[in-house]
C-alpha cells in the first residue's frame, strides 16, 4: 500500500506540474498576477530598499533606489564608508572608497550591463517581447529538493536568467544568471523568500546570492524597509562632479 501511495503522490505531482500552465506565456502571466498584476507593477514609479547584509559574519548596510525609466543607485556601507554604484539610464558610475577611490568615476562595460539590468524596475518578465527578451519553458526542476517550474529568459544583450517558480504560488524562488564576461562564462544564483506586499506588489525580503558553484562566498540581504513611489529626482542618479583641486600655493618671494 505504501508503494501505491508513493506512486500516486508522484503521479499527482507530475500532473500538477505538467498538466497545467505548460507554456511560457501562461507561466509568466500567472507569475505576474501572483505578484500583484501588471497594472499594480507598472503603477510603481520608484522603490527604495534598505537591508542588512551578512556573509559569514561580515556585516554591512545595503540600499537600493530605483526609478523609472531605467535608473538605479546601489549603496554598500561599512565602518563609516559607503560604496556607490549607479546607472542614470545611459551610463554608469561609482564611488569606491574601499579601494581608495573616493572620487566618482565611470564604470566599465561589464559593470554597466549588470546595473542596467538592475534598473529594470519591472524585471525581464514584464513586456518581455517589447524589451527583446526571449522566454522559454524548460519543464520542471528541483530547488532544495522541491519541484519548481523552470523558465529560461534570454535578454537582448545575451545574458541568460533561469527562473524557478514555486508550483503553488508561481512566484520565483530562485534565479540563476549566466554572463559572458571577457570570454568566460560567469554563473551566479539568487535565492528569494519571505515575500511581502508593498503597494500591492509582492517583493522578496530575503535575498541570498553569490557564485553558483561556491556557496561559501554567498551573502544574504535581509530587507528591513521597502518603500514604493517615494519622491526622488533624476539628479540622484547622475554622476557628481569630482571635487576641484585646491589652488596651488604661491611661492613667497625671497
Q: Which residues does each PLM region occupy?
A:
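Bacterial N-terminal signal peptides that target proteins for export
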Residues: 1-9
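N-terminal signal peptide c-region/cleavage motif recognized by signal peptidases
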Residues: 16-18
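Flexible, processing/modification-adjacent segments and terminal tails
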Residues: 20-33, 40, 91-159, 180-186, ...
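N-terminal mature ectodomain segment of secretory-pathway/periplasmic proteins
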Residues: 25-100, 134-139
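A short, sequence-level motif marking secondary-structure junctions
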Residues: 64-71, 88-91, 110-111, 166-169, ...
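Gly/Pro-enriched, hydrophobic low-complexity segments
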Residues: 81, 146-238
